[in-house]
Amino acid sequence: MKVTGIFLLSALALLSLSGNTGADSLGREAKCYNELNGCTKIYDPVCGTDGNTYPNECVLCFENRKRQTSILIQKSGPC
């Protein structure tokens, strides 16, 4: 009984530690496609890691290329 309790506590501790590695808090890269004619006007806002809201991922990619930066998407939706 004591061994089972220790095993369950150990398994629970391992599961809680493996749940969040902190990588998600950094953000994710925008899906950049080679848009020769520019970006669509579809409003699907994303929040950049620079604290600015971009109308969509394409606009964020365009700004990254223009400014030679690598701003990530912190979350979907406005900041």
Swiss-Prot record:
Residues at the site labelled Necessary for sperm binding: Y43, D44
A Gene Ontology term for the protein's cellular component: extracellular exosome
GO molecular function, one term: endopeptidase inhibitor activity
Record's keyword terms, sorted: Disease variant, Disulfide bond, Protease inhibitor, Secreted, Serine protease inhibitor, Signal
Endpoints of the signal sequence: 1-23
InterPro entries: Kazal_dom, Kazal_dom_sf, Prot_inh_Kazal-m
SUPFAM superfamilies referenced in this protein's UniProt entry, alphabetically: Kazal-type serine protease inhibitors
Disulfide partners: C32-C61, C39-C58, C47-C79
Record-linked PANTHER family: SERINE PROTEASE INHIBITOR (PTHR21312), SERINE PROTEASE INHIBITOR KAZAL-TYPE 1 (PTHR21312:SF27)
Functional summary from the UniProt entry: Serine protease inhibitor which exhibits anti-trypsin activity. In the pancreas, protects against trypsin-catalyzed premature activation of zymogens.
Related illness: Pancreatitis, hereditary: A disease characterized by pancreas inflammation, permanent destruction of the pancreatic parenchyma, maldigestion, and severe abdominal pain attacks.
Identification of the protein by name: Serine protease inhibitor Kazal-type 1
